[in-house]
């Protein structure tokens, strides 16, 4: 696995979000490293890991926006996935060694196809809604300070506790695709590939969803492809590839004066993520000094944007490797973005202790 090449930025990138369409075969950390080089700054982080095999939307924060990322971690996500029925692997995806070849013969005839579709629809329905999901054992979850995947590689039997997640929808994209896989002795094993669109809460493991679908159908399964298409209000169609971003930086170095890596301004990102609260000069000054406002000030906030980040603000620490949010209890529910009269993003605020208080000040005094 080679690291992506990236041009070195001539000037430091502005604070903001960077939407990258991650290619397969590179880690999320590799993308962060490339962004640091292109943005000429060490202050770059991401809002949730994608496995090396996966492609799609990776949201990076540059400069002060790294602090904003905490409030994106809990956003809902959408994926396009391919699941292979009839074969299991140790990692529950195509990167791991196969562990079982149960096979999934293609249904023949109208009656068999209808029966298969009925069982598939029922299995998908059982996996939709608020469910308890056992995360993949080969994951970055820590057990007594040691990553679960390391324990598995060291030969341990790992049993992770089920966690609550919400699967908003699972849509079948096209008809099931019967195909053939090679068995342990080179024999032909009939399998079926399913293309799915999954809309889910943060913390969902699509690999585990594939595993559980295979178990529900009695044939086993694993994930063969995964692409993240949205995070909260942001879509992969807005993202740039690493090569495109690098070419932009290289070209900008020759401008007079030189220009740097383009980012999505924090104010624009906040308006897309949260209801907007327009502050007076006095209110903005108070917030910049860390003071609260009367709680009824929050009632002036506008309507929540479409696909807004309605998840609670995260105040506990999160894992930098797996990107899953820790639960901050009631803290941060009903977050709004406060803007001064000049349109500058001052802070994210929420109701706390009977006051509207800042949970993140982005434009200090």
Indicate residue ranges for each PLM-predicted region:
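RNA pseudouridine synthases
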Residues: 2-208, 212-238, 348
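Accessory RNA 3′-end/elbow-binding domains used by RNA modification enzymes
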Residues: 1-23, 29-46, 50, 54, ...
């Amino acid at each position: 696995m080679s690291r992506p090449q990236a041009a070195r930025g001539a000037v430091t990138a502005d604070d903001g979000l960077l939407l990258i369409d991650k290619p397969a075969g590179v880690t999320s950390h590799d993308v962060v490293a490339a962004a640091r080089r292109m943005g000429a700054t060490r202050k770059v982080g991401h809002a949730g890991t994608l496995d090396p095999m996966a492609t799609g939307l990776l949201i990076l924060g540059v400069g002060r926006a790294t602090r904003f990322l905490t409030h994106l971690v809990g956003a809902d996500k959408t994926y396009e996935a391919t699941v292979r029925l009839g074969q299991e692997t140790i990692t529950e995806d195509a990167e791991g060694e196969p562990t079982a070849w149960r096979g999934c013969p293609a249904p023949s005839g109208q009656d068999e196809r209808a029966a298969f579709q009925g069982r598939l629809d029922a299995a998908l329905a059982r996996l939709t809604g608020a469910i308890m999901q056992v995360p993949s054992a080969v994951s970055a979850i820590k057990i007594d300070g040691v990553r679960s995947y390391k324990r598995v590689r060291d030969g341990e039997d790992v049993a992770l506790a089920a966690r609550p997640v919400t699967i908003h929808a699972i849509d079948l994209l096209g008809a099931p695709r019967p195909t053939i896989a090679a068995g342990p002795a080179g024999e032909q094993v009939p399998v079926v590939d399913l293309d799915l669109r999954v809309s889910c809460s943060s913390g969902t493991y699509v690999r585990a969803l594939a595993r559980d679908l295979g178990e529900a159908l009695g044939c086993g399964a694993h994930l063969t492809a995964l692409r993240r298409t949205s995070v909260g209000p942001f879509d992969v169609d807005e993202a740039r590839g690493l090569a495109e971003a690098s070419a932009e930086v290289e070209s900008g170095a020759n401008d007079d004066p030189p220009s740097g890596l383009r980012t999505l301004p924090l104010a624009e990102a906040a308006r897309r993520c949260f209801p907007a609260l327009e502050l007076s000069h006095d209110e903005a000054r108070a917030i910049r000094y860390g003071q609260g406002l009367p709680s009824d000030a929050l009632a002036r906030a506008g309507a929540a944007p479409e696909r807004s980040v309605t998840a609670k603000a995260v105040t506990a620490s999160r894992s930098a490797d797996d990107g899953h949010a820790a639960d901050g209890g009631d803290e941060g529910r009903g977050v709004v973005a406060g803007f001064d009269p000049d349109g500058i993003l001052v802070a994210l605020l929420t109701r706390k202790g009977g006051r509207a208080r800042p949970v993140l000040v982005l434009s200090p005094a």
